[in-house]
Amino acid sequence: TPEYQTKDTDILAAFRVTPQPGVPPEEAGAAVAAESSTGTWTTVWTDGLTSLDRYKGRCYDIEPLPGEESQFIAYVAYPLDLFEEGSVTNLFTSIVGNVFGFKALRALRLEDLRIPPAYSKTFQGPPHGIQVERDKLNKYGRPLLGCTIKPKLGLSAKNYGRAVYECLRGGLDFTKDDENVNSQPFMRWRDRFVFCAEAIYKAQAETGEIKGHYLNATAGTCEEMMKRAIFARELGVPIIMHDYLTGGFTANTSLAHYCRDNGLLLHIHRAMHAVIDRQKIHGMHFRVLAKALRMSGGDHIHAGTVVGKLEGERDITLGFVDLLRDDFIEKDRSRGIYFTQDWVSMPGVLPVASGGIHVWHMPALTEIFGDDSVLQFGGGTLGHPWGNAPGAVANRVALEACVQARNEGRDLAREGNE
């Protein structure tokens, strides 16, 4: 229905559609709109008992992709009433639930969603957000530093705590449980929580700075997850963590509500994201998963590194980094942003750069991500030839040097590692 005027309250979706040979774009686009809203495979008499005009998804625009004759972008508008308030789970079940297995399509990818304020306002969003986090930690004007404790699996709780202490003592703000550290036979969660809390308090006392360790509360059941979160709060630690895709949006949103009520920061890891977002023609782009997380709730989320990747990737990555941090993001196709997104007053999420980065990337990282980010060096800290603490010191010194140079007006991108 090309004559349809989108409403401010509609949820808009941009799909990259690859139809089967012989299926016209209009038909494929309409099929996507119907299957992800009110349609079924045949006309049913109960359709007469409701006003389909009011409730059906509409494909309102189709645009060809330059250089791809078999693909195009289909824009679909969904009426707000199709979705349960405050449920990312329901949003995804509706929009991407069934339609991706559709016979008439060879492949389908959800590139972007426009979430109207009327819908985003039904979510709590991040437990605290960027500003409140800085106030809690008393750290301003620079990116935060983190480090994932390696080897990720196999350390005893006592040795794990020791590694945490050394990194924090050396000058990092945070250390992190790996995403797959939950509660395994060699290190049960309660032992880990206790030893990490000890490490945090010792490092805080010795450095006079607030420290944290992302205690991974992800578990096999929601009840067990909450039990871990509650234990972390009782220990008085500042931050916990969750794997939001493997744990699920329902669990994540519950945890985010608990974190706001109890003053815990929530670090989010995106384990499993590549299963969904890796393919260029099928699945969902990470910017959609990032928007969903901002609604569901998290104070940090992993967002890739940019460094060492292609230049084109940089704009796309910064596009969804801004979607996480800013209140208002203009439509900009060169950055992969298909819709203008207005978050109104929903708190922002700190993007976490993590994975294969080390101290020589520091100038590039501070220049690309700016102050509102968490830079995480795992092997880049623990792999230091002299040990964890000197590795942490090296990272902190490099960061402070880069920030100082930038504040003095030097161009980090040009001067690089000198």
From Swiss-Prot:
Its main location: plastid. Substrate binds at residues 98, 148, 152, 270, 302, 354. The modification N6-carboxylysine is found at residue 176. It is found in: Plastid, Chloroplast. It catalyses: 2 (2R)-3-phosphoglycerate + 2 H(+) = D-ribulose 1,5-bisphosphate + CO2 + H2O; D-ribulose 1,5-bisphosphate + O2 = 2-phosphoglycolate + (2R)-3-phosphoglycerate + 2 H(+). CDD domains: RuBisCO_large_I (cd08212). It is an enzyme of class 4 (lyase). It comes from the Eukaryota. The active site is at 150 (proton acceptor), 269 (proton acceptor). Binds 1 Mg(2+) ion per subunit. RuBisCO catalyzes two reactions: the carboxylation of D-ribulose 1,5-bisphosphate, the primary event in carbon dioxide fixation, as well as the oxidative fragmentation of the pentose substrate in the photorespiration process. Both reactions occur simultaneously and in competition at the same active site. NCBIfam families: PRK04208.1. This is Ribulose bisphosphate carboxylase large chain. It comes from Pinus virginiana (Virginia pine).
